Amino acid sequence: MKCPFCGHSSTQVLDSRVSEDGDTVRRRRRCEACDRRFTTYERIELFFPAIVKKNGSRVDYARAKLKDSMRLALRKRPVSAEAIDEAITRIEEKLLALGEKEIPSSQVGELVMRELRKLDKIAYIRFASVYRSFEDVSEFREMLDEFSSSTPRKG
């Protein structure tokens, strides 16, 4: 591994540790030329399917974009960052399990809606209203009625 400080190509690994989830290795290294230390991370490279948008264009899957859209729906809601990350990981596992090279954005949207429904009902409704492009209040009301009839009432 090349030293980021002096560019020398010979470094020594001082310590290696596997992350808690088991998908990352953290290595502490020392440059044999300048004696400076640095950390590297080794991760499994996963190949997610390309996302086919409604207009037919294709974009690479981006975890950050998915996270941003979920955060927007969950804004000011009592859901932890950890819970959001876990939901995104479940979505990614489903995307990888499909084994497809391409997947329509609508399918990703449905996966997001399922996860949001489990996390927070208000966030689910927020996301669904934008995702399904409601044209008027009646469409919104239909979704709320569908949502209410499938959710048992407390009390």
UniProtKB/Swiss-Prot annotation:
InterPro entries: ATP-cone_dom (IPR005144), NrdR-like_N (IPR055173), RNR_NrdR-like (IPR003796)
One GO-annotated biological process of the protein: negative regulation of DNA-templated transcription
Domain ATP-cone: 49-139
Cleavable signal peptide: none
Cofactor binding note from Swiss-Prot or TrEMBL: Binds 1 zinc ion.
Keywords from the named record: ATP-binding, DNA-binding, Metal-binding, Nucleotide-binding, Repressor, Transcription, Transcription regulation, Zinc, Zinc-finger
GO molecular function: ATP binding; DNA binding; zinc ion binding
ZnF locations on chain (unnamed): 3-34
Cofactor list: Zn(2+)
HAMAP family per record: NrdR
Function: Negatively regulates transcription of bacterial ribonucleotide reductase nrd genes and operons by binding to NrdR-boxes.
Family: Belongs to the NrdR family.
Protein name listed in UniProt: Transcriptional repressor NrdR
The species this protein was found in: Cupriavidus metallidurans (strain ATCC 43123 / DSM 2839 / NBRC 102507 / CH34)
Protein's gene: nrdR
